[in-house]
Amino acid sequence: MMKNILLYKVLARYTSTKAARFVPKTGVYPKGYEVGGIHCGVKKDGKTFDLAILHNTHGKDASAAAVFTTNKFKAAPVQVSQKLIKETKGAGINSIVVNSGNANAVTGAQGMKDAEDMVIVTDSVLENKPNSTLVMSTGVIGNNLPIDNILSGIPKLALSHLGNSHQNWIDCATAICTTDTFPKLVSKQFTIGKDTYTLAGLCKGAGMICPNMATLLGFFVTDAPVSPSALQLILKYAVDRSFNSITVDGDMSTNDTIAAIANGAAGGELIDLNSSCAERYAELQKEITDFAQQLAQLVVRDGEGATKFITIKVKDALSYKDAKSIASSVANSSLFKTAMYGKDANWGRILCAIGYADVGNGSVVPQKTSVKFVPVDGSESLQLLQNGEPEKVDEERASEILADEDLVIEIDLGTGGGQGADFWTCDLSHEYVTINGDYRS
């Protein structure tokens, strides 16, 4: 009991302020979807939402795409959804069902059956064709689902609690959370040519977050008309530059899934891979990538115990791959992250992480490398290293910059390659240990 109280106090410390800042009061939502969330009995407190459904109501089959964890212990829902995407090639996937509080990972044959049953029951209740639903789970690894609770909860949710109001979307976003301190929901309208479309997305994640996705679930939906093959390529590009460019603690989970559904309810010309669609394709790719970055950054801002949001910006690398590898190396350094928590301008830890990044010869030349702190308020940056030469650091100015919640660290490799990448991370605090030390209690 005391562990639960302590964990609650740690989470509550962050919840009120972050929720007020990052949970939207209103939203704009795409045509032809209904969503919702309820408590069905996965979580033990008897009231916290733990079951979510999204459903395409447009009347025409949607296109779908998904990217999944690279962890070798893929959870049952990941395997089931991966198989569905492969078999359907993304055509005719019209719903998503998610439970939180239990990952259904490393649960053997029973876990596979449970994930498949979630698909079957959801399809039946929503009057979908068979195999039209993606399934996701998140929570504690190694325990079987309370599947009877979930299977009885699906009809209750699907028949009585789905809609397209802002509250429906908030309920859906809340129902997929675990240690998150606020639901993560973003929506916007955009135009391609003369057509106006809407994009909405939600995700969960606060710990076990690192590239190639972690305990991270999310989905984007749009009313734009997009072919499955085009949507898959766009999603992969966007995720690589968003959810695969964040880290909280360097741990990769068994359950990661990011999915996208496009139902075409807003009309307009189909966006596919034909050369005639190149301009519309590029515009949609940019919109979804920018959108994915917004959502991914919310995950970092809600990092377990985090007090800082840090952007690692690498410039003038030989390739995008090099830039991302170097940014990732710094972002995942525990020594760097603890220094940021302690407001310590120990830039040697940044250089150390740059130096062991997995890049080729010539990718990092110490004599050409520069590093600086860039305040987000627009005030003057603080140069730490210039072309391999250390600068005399104004410790008082460094403390002022590091006292802010947001910080940009700019690394200029000076290679002449002109390539760059951004990576987002947070600090590593005492609270992170407290939260994860008590996670199962």
Swiss-Prot record:
Marked site (Cleavage) residue numbers: 214-215
Primary subcellular site in the record, as a coarse category: mitochondrion
EC nos: 2.3.1.35, 2.3.1.1
Compartment annotation: Mitochondrion matrix
Binding site for substrate: 178, 204, 215, 304, 436, 441
Keyword Chloroplast: no
Family annotation (SUPFAM superfamilies): DmpA/ArgJ-like
Misc. remarks from the entry: This protein may be expected to contain an N-terminal transit peptide but none has been predicted.
Family assignment from sequence similarity: Belongs to the ArgJ family.
Name of the protein: Arginine biosynthesis bifunctional protein ArgJ, mitochondrial
